[in-house]
Amino acid sequence: KKFIDLVQLFASNIQKDANGDPCIFFNDKLAPVMAAKATYIEPLQNAGIKVILNVLGDHKGIGISNLTDDQIEKFAAILTYIVKEYGLDGIGFDDEYADYSTPIDPTSASKLVLKLREKFNAEFPGERKIIQMFQWNYASNISAAAGAEIDLADHGAFGPNVFQTSSAFAGVTNDRWCP
């Protein structure tokens, strides 16, 4: 029996391109892993371990909680391309370190989850790609519809609340919380 069944590549960063739209950045630690998927990613998958890419803020004023509808469409397309290009099993979101400079849209993270699920379903018919969410910052306010599309959720709680017994994300059932 496997001790580990999922690896999250930590972390890619959401940044802005020259037009202010979201793009993904692989830092100097992650880029070599992504470039050598046959060495690092595929052996894990061949052993039955799912591999997902984490998307984290990068102090650039943009994150999953302040995207416009147009940016959500573009970013979901980018993430779907990355999953296909690198043969990944899904995407994980972490709303830390965005340093939001534009107003927060409380529906942005929900819309992104729903759009990403739509694009995953279109690109990978019959295969459910993983969407993971870290319960932190503004992403804690996702809708029940978006929560229903999240496969794995991580508590953003530490200390005495680390073992919460109920879902803090609307639509996420207790069986989808990571241990």
What is the role of each PLM region?
Residues K1-P179:
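Chitinase-like catalytic core of GlcNAc-active glycosidases
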